[in-house]
Amino acid sequence: MKNTDIRSFDLTQRTIFGLLSQTLFGAAYTPEPDVDWTEVYQESENQAVRLQTFANHHLIPDIPDELREKIRRYLAAAMLRNARIHGEHTYVHTLLTQNGIAYSVLKGAGSACYYPDPLTRAMGDVDFFVSREDFDRALALFAREGFTASGQDHICHVVLRKKPIHLEMHFEPAGVPDGEVGEKILSYLSDLRACAVPLKSRLTTCMRPCDFHHGLIMLMHLQHHLLAEGIGLRHLCDWAVFVNHFRPNEFRETFEERLKAVGLWRLARLLSLSAALYIGLPEQDWMRDDPEDGEIAGQLMVDIVAGGNFGKKNRQRAYEGLFISNRGKDGVGNNRLKEGFGALNRITRAKCPFTQRVPILLPVGWVAVLLGYLFRNHKRNQTKGHVSAADAYKKSSARQQLYRKLGLYEPEL
């Protein structure tokens, strides 16, 4: 069974893989000679895994003193921030439950609880789900609490802000595709709130999804960002520790049949295999189903690392994604020029609302959007660097070919 040799990754990347395997799964690991620890620190930041990478920094004598002090300060500040965000989960829980609104968090503390130490998971904002029937009532409730709502035209959530709290209230998880597969996924999620599980720890009290719902939500979220800007190692770590908490064959029994029906089982297998090959997740037989799976899992890992967390390492990837897919909603099999043209139309309608009211003016909107792109690119040339649409189109080809191998939202009958 052919795998992408770990030596295909550079020393900095291999070091991060080894440290992650040590932190997440207790694997024995000794760094190779000549590691540039400043580069490791920077790359772990790009991947949003500094906490997991340096959780055991005291066991690494080669880290320079100045960098070690920087690491200590970062770990202390990051864990304090994470503890605060766990507390915000409790705040949301208390507010909603005291007012009779059933809900479930999405990811967040629900992902952190699978880590050996939940504080080592880099936390973002608080995402949670309420039903469409309760949505307006919940919105009014947060308004009375002093939150400002924005993004009401978003496809699946509203943003709620009251400094320093940042919330995303969903009426639908991100990444649900169009068509019959999307309808089946929504049927899977119809009892999301009813099946939610209480999470009570030293850090938080909230309602989290059951294992099946959590895995499904993560897979949709992962493909949603993978096809666009990229996911980075943080998301792979979330997936790996989740898979690791199942007993042997329990994961397969829980997920295989239902995920095959919506075309996500192959993604689940190959993500798990990537984590097993490179960051220490114990491998199980269900992770491989084809002699080429090891090679595909390696290619997937190369892609994950290349993008960084939400494309932090390569801003052009988001533009490449416009030629690959509409974040998976219509699959990844379309012609890239057709995808790019579709993306231009979606962006134009969003940025120039008059084109929705008067469709004949859509070409005028195209001009406005393209002029805006040229203006922003001019400014980037002076600051962060040029983003080439032609280069994005060219590089999108290899990525699309890889993603087609994942069979996203293509049911396995």
What are these regions (language model features)?
Residues K2-G124, V130-L413:
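Conserved NTP-donor binding/palm subdomain of two-metal-ion nucleotidyltransferases/polymerases, i.e.
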